[in-house]
Amino acid sequence: MRLEPVDGYFGEDVIVFEGLNRGGYIARGFDVVAPDLENADPVHHNALESDLVALLAVLKPGQRMQVQWTVNSDYRRELLRYRDDTMKFAKNEWSQRQRNERFVRYWRMMEEGLLRREKLRLYFTLPVDGDAFGARRGRLSTSALLSAYQEEFHQLGLFVNALFGTSGGRVHPMTDADHFQHYLEFLNPSLPEQKITDPLEFFDPEKSIQENCWHGECRPLEKPDTGFYHDCYYHGMLALKSLPKHTRPSLAYLLTKLGFRDYALTVNIDPVDVERLIEREQKELTRVEGDYESLRKVKLLAAMKTKAAKIARYSNGENSPYRLQYIIRAWDKSREDLRAKLTALKAAVSNMERAQAYEPALETSARNFFYSSWPGWSFSRYGALWHDYDDAMVANILPFSSTPVGHLDQAEFIYDGTNGNLVGGRTFCGEGNSLTPQHAVTIGTMGSGKSVNAIDILTQTEPFFAFTMIADEGCSYSVYTRTVDPLAEPIIVQANGKLTMNYLDTRGLPLSGLHLSAASALPMLMVGRSQDEDRTKLRHALLTNAVNRLYDDFARWYANHHADKYTLLARRACALDAYRRERMGPQATDLDAFIEFKEFTQEHADEAAGFLARFNESEVTQFAKDAAGAQQLRNLVFAEFQPAEYPQHGHLQELLAAEASGSHADEMRYLATLLEPWSANGSYGELFDGVSNVDLVGKIAHFELSYIPESAEELKAAAAFLIANYTRSHMMRMPRGLRKRNIFGEVARFALVPSGRKVVRESYEQLRKYNVWNLAEVQNYGQFKSSDIRGPVLGNSRILLLQRQTDRTNVEDLSKDFPIPDAVKDAVMSHPEPEKLVGQKYAQFTYYHTDERRPLIVTMRNVASREMLYCASSSGAHYDKRAKELKGYANVVEGIIANA
């Protein structure tokens, strides 16, 4: 039997086969990104099986579904979007250069066929309703008929999206352009070699499918080869002659995860009418029972039991029956390579629980199977090798898989995967104005490539951020800092230096609970904890009270010396309180209201002035006298201070010494004595005591802590804590819509700060509202694991960048917060060390992104450019050599290019 290929038309986002009339068919496709289960637990595989059974159940008698799966190297759309983002947002030479290097490298790999990507599409095909053209219903207009089918496809799409969207999949209804491009790719395997910029230029909706996409005949191959030659490629066809005897979830991976490209799987599925099937089986059972009564053969008894069980299974709805046709096509420019592919595919089929593949010897049969696999065409008249199968078994052999690509469609950074794929990640997620920062933690041992990975991610994402703060030790980021801002030098934090960061300076913001917590925590670190826990609590209470009294004193001083300004501030405080209550949510703080009203004033000056003026003098006076209002007014005063006007560490120490009285007088004097070494005349100079002289005006601030000796661990912890709070105020003053980020070189140091847990948690949660992304680095996981900041850091982080680990117990501990499948745990333990790799070196890590549905887990390989390695390497010998080589360059990027 020789068939002719089907023809039809694209229009109104559907495909019409054989005319929109009785005997015709109408289809629509859906582009599907299957849930990425490569590193998932068995529970997720079982859940996918259940979802696929539900998908099959949506088919009504007479309707058919087709699963189209193929593998190629097409990352064109995502790479072009990445390039467009570079052109649009990257103003920095270094970021431009590194992003362009990745784009060019990946584009070349794509054109050379070195990349691999699986694609999955679903097609639903419905017969055109014959009654629509009959006398009983009257003749429907073409548009009305199409509208009816479009609505049915729309509902199917909503169902499929709801089904797989909850487990991390994505479903996109295909348009006319999508249908055309799928057919063009399907019928023209040489299309990628033609380097056509926009295939849609060739789309003519007035022409049929064959006129648009079918540009050559198939001709038979000479024996002993089977199949046909078409579009410069040799094609071979296989079909499943017998299906697996038993199935399990992910069984189809044996076919979809082969290590080569250019083959496709097509599964045509037809639901069986259960009532008719039961009736037919009942008749068969009656006949077999009669034969058994006559012959008494054991074989007939077994057949009776099988048929009875089948009838019972279908009658109680335990299973649903389907018919399916499973077609495999492979193509290659070489006959020998095609034979090798077909051999590998046959072996893969055999491994699927004793399934068997059939290779048609006749070119006519091969063509018929080819025509039966055309996209959307599941009603071919070629009835060979259709099989009856139950729903769960059908679900397990469907090629429902796709390549793990992470967040590639909206990637801010891109890396290689482990199977020829590209993987993307992002620091913000959401849609439109609802983008939120996805705080991250990177964990890795020494030599795992942690520094190179961190700087590479910072480089690729730099175009999207307005400000970067780095607190590090070891000068790992010193060269990168200069690539962002040529004038930026590391801010050296050391004892007895000239750097001063006043921890009592609110940096132009009102006094807030968050600032008070930090301002009390730092002196508490300075005085240390007592072995007596009650005495420690007393110290903290006394210090908090003293800090509050100090702010009270300075606020009164301001009110007495700036009476006119104080009156205006009272009106502003009253207006801010009303603004928060009337226009902001119940969770908004006074600080939130201050920042939002400031932006509101800049954008709507007249309206803001009117809002301030609406309160009369008596209302303002009453607000200022009220206890809560007076507190808000006191806090607002500090937003008007100049750096030299703020209280300083020395003032706190003097207050404790001068006002020591009552039952705790001795303790207060003792605290004053303990705080004295931290004053300007003490052991650490002006670092904590004096007028702030660090001005954060550029795009990046790099604080270097390596000049503080390891023996001064408390000083290093205090400095890191001070930096975090100092830059936090700067970020909160910037426009909220701009992205900012904090990079903490060793976040475990915050554990040494009393109340460090509280401040880290509040900082993470509070700064999320101000578009601040945090990246915390952990090298000493043992110290981090036992600290009290582990909870707030991991609890507020959505991304885990997991480098090579050497201690399995650390990975198990991480699983308490980030449920890590056993397969991923094994992979993390075996990530290679970059320095021990032979040939091309790379830093491999696991990208774990939590989601409200389920975690996204992919493996990334950072094949860094020579320039990136030169910039980011932190080894001692390389550091000294690089410093000498770059010394003479005003433009550090030019120096990197010249010496890399």
Map each language-model feature to its residues.
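Hydrophobic anchor at the beta1->P-loop junction of P-loop NTPases
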Residues: 442
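Hydrophobic positions on the alpha1 helix immediately C-terminal to the Walker A/P-loop
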Residues: 453
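Pre-Walker A adenine-sensing motif
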Residues: 421-433
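Walker A (P-loop) phosphate-binding loop of P-loop NTPases
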Residues: 447
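P-loop NTPase motor domains
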Residues: 35, 42-58, 72, 255-256, ...
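P-loop NTPase motor core of the ASCE superfamily
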Residues: 108-113, 511-567, 788-900
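Extended, folded cores of ATP/NTP-driven motor/assembly subunits in large transport
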Residues: 1-387
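Conserved lysine of the Walker
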Residues: 450
